[in-house]
Amino acid sequence: AGYYETDYQKQMFKDIKFAIHSGKLVAITGIIGCGKTTTLRRLFDVLEKEGKMIVSKSLCVEKKRTTLPTLIAALFYDLSTDKEIKIPKDGEKRERELRNLIKKGKKPVALFVDEAHDLHYSTLTGLKRLIEVVEDSGGILSVVLAGHPKLKNDLRRPMMEEIGYRTTVFSLEGIVGNQREYIEWLVSECTIDDTVSSDILDAEAIELLATRLRTPLQIEQHLTLAFEAAYRVAVKPVTTVIIESVLSKQIDDLEPTLTRHGYDVSGLAEQFNAKPAEIKLLFRGQLDPPRARELQEQMLAAGLPL
């Protein structure tokens, strides 16, 4: 359907670009389905086409196992012009060669890392120090991290102070506040020119979707389900009854809400010194009330949405 962008998103895009050119850690955070990966791709493509920076991207999919050497390797692969790329195993030699490689390119460098909420704090600390190593030699290296809101909350933790205070964080709200406009735009983009949205979607149905859903991913999924359900029972336009029948009843429950923010059972158990079984009982509303209150207070203090 193309790319939908609000005025707020357009301004944020400009602000992110400016921060990237400054040579620092930049974090873009947002819930699942809000458009982080799409924004990251657009940033990468725009910077690459402008030609003022050299852009690099980590392709490693196992982010929980991704270490600083893995990300440095991504820089070597994207910056080197040699046919055979040899990355030194010795840390001192590796960093020196990378520094020289960046100086040789005579342009600022930006490294893009998606799903960065899974990176270990030692990896994030290493990236911060790598930026400083490059800066000391007169070069500019920016690292652009994209991840769930967990990344933003982690950067605020006391143990992450060294990195958090030096990171420019952008919270991507996506289409929040513009859901109705997004639905109407999406329908117009996906139908033939003379189709009116009211012919296939009741105004009340649009309002219900806009009220209950927050992200493009949620809206696209539920619109597809609604059109399929309406087709099966030969109903046109789609009504609120159809929408209610396909809306997930658990969409705003605690577990899916925290999942959209990047938290799972094991991660929550580790962060709040709880047993996985306690977290599962909390999700089901079956945990002992005093213990439930204790965990909820800790989670609220850490910035989790309860």
Predicted regions located by residue number:
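The catalytic "switch" region of P-loop NTPases
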Residues: K107-V109, G126-I200, E204-I206
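A short, basic N-terminal segment
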Residues: A1-V26, P305-L306
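Post-Walker A helix-loop "phosphate-sensing" segment adjacent to the P-loop in P-loop NTPases
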Residues: V46-V55, S80-K83, E135
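Walker A/P-loop nucleotide-binding motif
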Residues: S22-R42
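C-terminal alpha-helical "lid" subdomain
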Residues: S188-I192, V196-L306
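Conserved P-loop NTPase "ATPase switch" module shared by AAA+ and STAND
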Residues: L101-T123, L127
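Conserved NTP-binding/hydrolysis module of P-loop NTPases
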Residues: E62-I85
